[in-house]
Amino acid sequence: MKLLNKIKNENAIEFQVLIEKSEWEKKHNEAFEKVAKKTASKLKIPGFRPGNVPVEEAKKHVNEIEVFETTTNDLVPQALTFLEQDESFTSDNSETVDTPSIDILDFKDGELTLKIAYDLYPVATIDSYNDLVLTPIVNEAFDHEVNAEIEHALSSKSQRRVKDENELIEKGDEVRFDFKGMIDNVPFQGGSAKDHLLTIGSNQFIPGFEDQMIGLKVGEQKNLEVKFPDDYHATDLAGRSAVFEVLIKEITSVKPQELNDEFAKSFNLPNVNTVQELKDYIHNQIVLAKQERNSERAWLEIAQQLLAKAKVTPIPQSLIDREVSTLKQQVISQLSQYKIDLKQYLEFSKKSESQFQEDLVKQAKETIALALLVDDIAENQKIVVSDDEVKERIAEMAKLYQGEEEAIIERLSQNPDAVKEFLLHKKVVNYLIDLNKNNQPKDTASTLSKQEDKPKVAKAKTSNTKKVASKK
């Protein structure tokens, strides 16, 4: 074999390999015998039973195209081995994507010329990433947020009992009832509801309303005479007298849970044995939730700016196709959780299949480019993930599946690269946030106030751009 030529551009590298006549003839003879035996096993000729045609007789009926294809297919692995041991290949430090494409360039005088082409792994570069503009991030936990979580926890632990029809409403009871409000015997907008739930003594209604419900029982009706406060938000009702006709449907006795150390211990949280330790734990959970949520939002801002500033070499179609397939399967999997198929989704979103495909291609290109940029930034800034960090992350994830920890650890340990990529992405995002934390937009006051809203304490899912292909 001989290497005839090497052609390289920014997204592919092509080699032309000549298979000489002696090599071709040797493989051709072997292929001819192989095809002849195959032909003999299924050839039908008068005078011979099916499957018993002599090979020598079968050779007269061999398909030469099949022999040619068999010869070529048998030579391809040898050609690849020859090429990948050749200095022109081994001295080239280009990163190639997966297996090459192989085509026949020429067959002349018993010699075969193959074109072996590799897609090159794309390269993404960016001149600077210290000038990214980020919405201000507030990861602080406020007292009212902690107290709200405590109140919610107390409520969830309270003892509840539906009262029988002869028991009366008391302060602290939760009541389900219908009401209809009237002013001068005329119903007013927003003054009526059915099956409304109200905790007596919560002061959710206007003064005097809840107090007049005390002592009523299930099935009882009563007209409550009240007066809207002079500073009531609805100016057409402010200062006016009204009558509310109420019908009691259900009364639930609610015995509040006392906030004490026993209550704190009941959650079986690590190192939580007192009320203060519970508050500290909730405080930390709120901070973690805000960090995750704000990191995810910041990544969306960072990603768009990185894409706008980056230079990316052409992305091979093979990579795009693979990422499109992955993204499509993710969409289908997510839809299946809501018992919706892709066709129904497209109808609901008013998209054609071609539009959906275009969106996937665009997203795939961005995902690939961002993965490359994350790797590039990590390499430039020497950001790495240690094996111990991977093990620690796997252990953390396993804790979320009580009773299945060992199985989860075993499964994740079989694919540590995925965990490492997740952690590397997270480290790079945190690095970029810290690097650009002072690059704020001009109007930040409203944004800061919005970030004080109560977050979900449950851990948010961090956005993760995964690597699209293993490099050769």
Curated annotation (Swiss-Prot):
Keyword Isomerase set for record: yes
Protein name in the entry: Trigger factor
Annotated PROSITE patterns: FKBP_PPIASE
Described purpose of this protein according to its UniProt entry: Involved in protein export. Acts as a chaperone by maintaining the newly synthesized protein in an open conformation. Functions as a peptidyl-prolyl cis-trans isomerase.
HAMAP family named among the record's database cross-references: Trigger_factor_Tig
Domain text: Consists of 3 domains; the N-terminus binds the ribosome, the middle domain has PPIase activity, while the C-terminus has intrinsic chaperone activity on its own.
Coiled-coil residue spans: none
Highest taxon above the source species: Bacteria
Disulfides per UniProt: none
InterPro entries reported in the protein's UniProt record: PPIase_dom_sf, PPIase_FKBP_dom, Trig_fac, Trigger_fac_C, Trigger_fac_C_sf, Trigger_fac_ribosome-bd_bac, Trigger_fac_ribosome-bd_sf, Trigger_fact/SurA_dom_sf
Keywords, sorted A to Z: Cell cycle, Cell division, Chaperone, Cytoplasm, Isomerase, Rotamase
Region (Disordered): 439-472
Gene Ontology molecular function terms on file: peptidyl-prolyl cis-trans isomerase activity; protein folding chaperone; ribosome binding
EC number: 5.2.1.8
GO biological process: 'de novo' cotranslational protein folding; cell division; chaperone-mediated protein folding; protein transport; protein unfolding
Record's compositionally biased regions (Polar residues): 439-449, 461-472
Biological source species: Ureaplasma urealyticum serovar 10 (strain ATCC 33699 / Western)
Domain PPIase FKBP-type: 172-257
